[in-house]
Amino acid sequence: MEEIRGLSYEQNKKYQFAIASGYFDEWEADPRKWKHTFIGAFIWKYPSRVKVLNILTDIIGNSPTWEDMSDDVLRDFVDDLTENVAPSSAKTYCAELKSVLNENKRRIPCTDFMKILSVKGTATQSVYLTAHEMELFVAYKPRTNIEQYVHRNFCVSMLTGARQVDAGRLTISNCDIETNMLSYVPQKTPGVIVRVPVDERHGLRNFLADSNLEPCCLDTYNDVVRKICRCVGIDTICTVVKAGKNETAPKWKLTSSHTARRSFATNLYLAGVSLEDIAMMMGHGKNIETTKRYICAERNLNPNVMSYFQPAQSQS
């Protein structure tokens, strides 16, 4: 058992998962100060909920702080949960985070966290970009460095199914010319190798070659995604279900960084690709239940299914 000086044996045992995950690294320098950080306050109250901190770290790109608790970060947190855990678990995690934020609400920029994190134990519904809307987004010409970064990474994520954190790391060197496959090891699941066919229709190689761009924070990223969607006319009026309530708005208003992976999964599904294959390409392995949460549309029954129920043709 890894031990932290200043903690009792029982405390070391109680917080072992968090210690092993590196969340107690700053403890010994100043225990009192550490307990007043976001990580300290959350872990001290919920020692077994390292998963919540890991999700926030993936979203933000660094260890979460009070200052990181913005509207967009919390909305992406809810999106991530609803796509990767059961609705009942998402409700529990959100309630726990809400409790910690409520005790420290003067320290965070988000004033609407109670509403954002009020998740019911029911499934949510989100938007995706259709094949035509994907073409519109890909064709957009960025006007600033920030737009170039967001446009590039969103397109890579949308064309490969990679998480945002992985999309930023992918380059042309991840492509195999002989097999025309892109392969990489996800940051979230380092023991897995993901392989995806290179999308030649939308010029994926060009986006992969355009790397080393200056990153931006998640709030800015989502704002730019919505701006681009609005500029290219992705404005169909949509009604989605969030936290058990209907929300109606132009589609561009309902998009975020997560829309890229949803678009990848949903369009493949509508094209008839099996959930098992989509799961492999998204790094979910054999866990198709996780993949199902990224599917935002229903597809028609295969003609072979319909023919099965038809009477056999009699031969004359």
Where are these regions (language model features)?
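Basic/aromatic-enriched alpha-helical hairpins
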Residues: 5-84, 99-106, 113-115
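Catalytic-site neighborhood detector that most strongly recognizes the C-terminal catalytic loop/helix
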Residues: 128, 187-190, 282-308
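Short, polar N-cap/turn motifs at the start of nucleic acid-interacting alpha helices
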Residues: 174-179, 273-293
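Conserved tyrosine-mediated DNA breakage-rejoining catalytic core shared by Y-recombinases
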Residues: 169-206
